[in-house]
Amino acid sequence: MSFIVIIPARYESSRLLGKPLMDIQGKPMVEWTWMQAKKSGATRVVIATESDRVKAVCESFGAEVCLTSERHESGTERIAEVASLLGLNDDDILVNVQGDEPLLPPDLIHQVAEGLETHPNTLMATLCEPILDVETVFDPHAVKVIRDCNNYALNFTRAPMPWSRDTFGSEPKTLPGNWPYRRHIGLYAYRSGFVKRYVEWPVCALEQVEKLEQLRVLWHGEKILVLDALCEAGVGVDTEQDLIKVRKIMANLNPDGAL
């Protein structure tokens, strides 16, 4: 199977300025993510950034880098520009690995690409994992996904959804026993031709409110396949607290700085 990993790495992050270059065990965060992507079986790994500074750092550790516009609303928009700049074929499978996922298992990158390849009529695929505690359901940084009976997404939201009337209405809140809550893993596979279509659609109101790029796809009536992840996704870095947590994890796993 042939697929290309593209890693959006935005220096001007709204929550953590310079996030791709933040140090973890002597390497910038984006380098750890790139190293994981290189182990996934991808035929090519490209880092996409709007920053000359990020570009220079990434090229220094041997990565292929594509300099993109500063005006993109999302990683998928940045990937569409890369597909155009590199002249990728419409049938090429692209995997969007966010640059703030230094612990993302390579097996999950391969899984989402394979999921798209084995569903030829599907335009976009992603992954999810079980939510085991009620705190995560109420955490706005944990995106919840609801699927239909064929594992296609009905909705993605930061809100506690679905709302359990019986167990969320009083304290202490508990998870209901009759619903499998799922956390979305922000990893996408799509064909190059589809991302070119994606950027032609206007940003939708729901996407703007939730700040979730995948909602544009559902808004325009297309489907997203959501597969159960084969293993735990690891901790991504959205906040300063996440960064502290990841540094502790990697210091314990990698006292010599090697993942």
From Swiss-Prot:
<keyword id="KW-0963">Cytoplasm</keyword>
<dbReference type="Pfam" id="PF02348">
    <property type="entry name" value="CTP_transf_3"/>
</dbReference>
<comment type="function">
    <text>Activates KDO (a required 8-carbon sugar) for incorporation into bacterial lipopolysaccharide in Gram-negative bacteria.</text>
</comment>
<comment type="pathway">
    <text>Bacterial outer membrane biogenesis; lipopolysaccharide biosynthesis.</text>
</comment>
<keyword id="KW-0548">Nucleotidyltransferase</keyword>
<dbReference type="InterPro" id="IPR003329">
    <property type="entry name" value="Cytidylyl_trans"/>
</dbReference>
<dbReference type="InterPro" id="IPR029044">
    <property type="entry name" value="Nucleotide-diphossugar_trans"/>
</dbReference>
<keyword id="KW-0448">Lipopolysaccharide biosynthesis</keyword>
<dbReference type="InterPro" id="IPR004528">
    <property type="entry name" value="KdsB"/>
</dbReference>
<dbReference type="GO" id="GO:0033468">
    <property type="term" value="P:CMP-keto-3-deoxy-D-manno-octulosonic acid biosynthetic process"/>
</dbReference>
<dbReference type="GO" id="GO:0008690">
    <property type="term" value="F:3-deoxy-manno-octulosonate cytidylyltransferase activity"/>
</dbReference>
<dbReference type="GO" id="GO:0009103">
    <property type="term" value="P:lipopolysaccharide biosynthetic process"/>
</dbReference>
<comment type="similarity">
    <text>Belongs to the KdsB family.</text>
</comment>
<comment type="pathway">
    <text>Nucleotide-sugar biosynthesis; CMP-3-deoxy-D-manno-octulosonate biosynthesis; CMP-3-deoxy-D-manno-octulosonate from 3-deoxy-D-manno-octulosonate and CTP: step 1/1.</text>
</comment>
<keyword id="KW-0808">Transferase</keyword>
<protein>
    <recommendedName>
        <fullName>3-deoxy-manno-octulosonate cytidylyltransferase 1</fullName>
        <ecNumber>2.7.7.38</ecNumber>
    </recommendedName>
</protein>
<dbReference type="GO" id="GO:0005829">
    <property type="term" value="C:cytosol"/>
</dbReference>
